[in-house]
């Protein structure tokens, strides 16, 4: 077998399909762009949905890619099996309505078996097909020449995730030999496609030819597609003859580096240790790429997944004897392994290391955080007069802080509480069910819109240079059908040329009107989006008859566009100013450009201080007042990068790109509309800055007239406050507010003193009744206070004054009874425990409880039982 590196295999795959007329699509960011159904990009086809559901028509219907992907559905299996990974690469070739089975099947065989390419032994390959897919069966047998006994019909070979595109698929298996197997040769599962380790699936070709309708019916799609997927890690393990994916050049450098950081553990010596080595190597790849693509550790969403992976790796490091921070040291190794196709990892190495190191340091505090949450949970349960920690709370401790259920149960028992084990298991099962369903939910696709797909009109955008264009109306769509004319209602229009900007890149669509050549307004443009074939599709409210083929005048609202261009140019200035103040690690994470305000999301590890925010704002205004020219140039992507233009990692760029340059200060790739000069913006004012997720911040701002209005409104508000507070000038407001705060603090202090004095008077009355109970002095009383907090205060005073050996107090709040028991040290030594006593008397008030030997509490629902409970306490001690 050929000796090939993983980098060579990846490149050979792309080169093979490039020779077959495919465009090579660069690997997209792991963070989905404009796809709310996905947490992560989890397959090669996930980034191509817009082509397959017909929203966009690709320049070339033949596409190939090597797509980095993350799946965490089966995270508990990582390290325990030969092939489960959180991060992996999918090699894929795709046809959007072009070639089909007759080409896809022979090409797969050629790539795998040809000596020019991978050169696998054809005798070790088997395929599976859907029983009803006679075409695929025929092609494998007649065109490829595969023997019938190596074509296995499997009922599960039908790709269907609910509504949307679906179809039969064909899988290719490599026979690794019986020595790799985990079942006997005569086992019924010992066949390609069965549950065994001998036959390894290396390629899956999906023939997407049907559309699954909501009513369950399957109809043929207007355009049939090919969607293939081959895991790079699997294919490399076959080529490098590795026992599992982990013994390949994609993982072994990471495993070896981890072993070098362990005092005494080595890979291959102990099965349990090997699992930890594999988990660390796998998770190091996932977190490195995820952070590089803009994800940050957090307590929800993809940030939570990231945090869980880092902490899981750290815990496995501890099992290997690695107690210091180490995960961040694996980042450059990941970068070196993958640099031939993903050079950006090494370019961002310092930032990725910083994020992981920070998370490792933070994790040391996590167990303490977990303990604090557990204590708060226990206190809350007691305050509600309950005796059980619910399953959801126990699961949160496990899921967020890594607290094993056994540890939570142990702490609860010390406090006289129990844990809802059944509820915990229910939460665990629900999480696993969500994980199982995630793949099908995430991969859902919309159906193709044949009407829009069939619109082939060439449409030119003229809006960079003019706001009014005369153009021929080429297509009218109403009621999901092409029309020759339209007289009323809402319609969608395509013109041969238009000045209207279609929504893209965070910039909203233009608004305006359409006039006939007589000057009459015939429609109002309310929205503009791109049609599947790339034309601006105008959504309009029709006022007068419009006829296909007739010329009209399209006019963009100049006030609307004027506000948009100012705010869009401001986002470019803001982006560069943030980099100048916070550092080059800061990246744009999203934006919204409206005519009256702008929103800008960016990555940053910590909060932005008021001083930093003020500096950013000052820089932007300085550039506005410097009257810098705004120029644009079209060039190829490589030239743009050499010029130093900033590109967004979430964007995909074509061969020709537009560079927007603001003086010598800012240069970005951007297809939006902009001001001609920064002086057009007039003024820039940040209105808010906040965190919208771990490592992601959001700035909202206004420019020009909106900025003036914002500042003027603030002045009006200050004047109103000054009037209400009887202050002559607004500059004196801070001093007045400080005075009011000091006065309030003094009043609060006096109030607390009065409450304490009242509590002492109450305590004196409660503690007067000391009675003998056997050999012990007992205070047992209905304290008649507000609730459990007040009972605890009384118990604290009792402990300080050492009034008796045992204290039993009760009170009623509404229909709830609260009980507290406290025991002095000498009585505890003699065997009297607060937890035992509370368990005896709590049932008499219709409740239960528990606690420590020195203090316990309970709740109940039977106020009438208080006298019996107090009497029972005396009997218990007698």
UniProtKB/Swiss-Prot annotation:
Source organism superkingdom: Bacteria
Main location: cytoplasm
GO BP: any one term: alanyl-tRNA aminoacylation
Cofactor annotation comment: Binds 1 zinc ion per subunit.
E.C. code: 6.1.1.7
Annotated GO CC locations: cytosol
Domain comment (free text): Consists of three domains; the N-terminal catalytic domain, the editing domain and the C-terminal C-Ala domain. The editing domain removes incorrectly charged amino acids, while the C-Ala domain, along with tRNA(Ala), serves as a bridge to cooperatively bring together the editing and aminoacylation centers thus stimulating deacylation of misacylated tRNAs.
Name assigned to this protein: Alanine--tRNA ligase
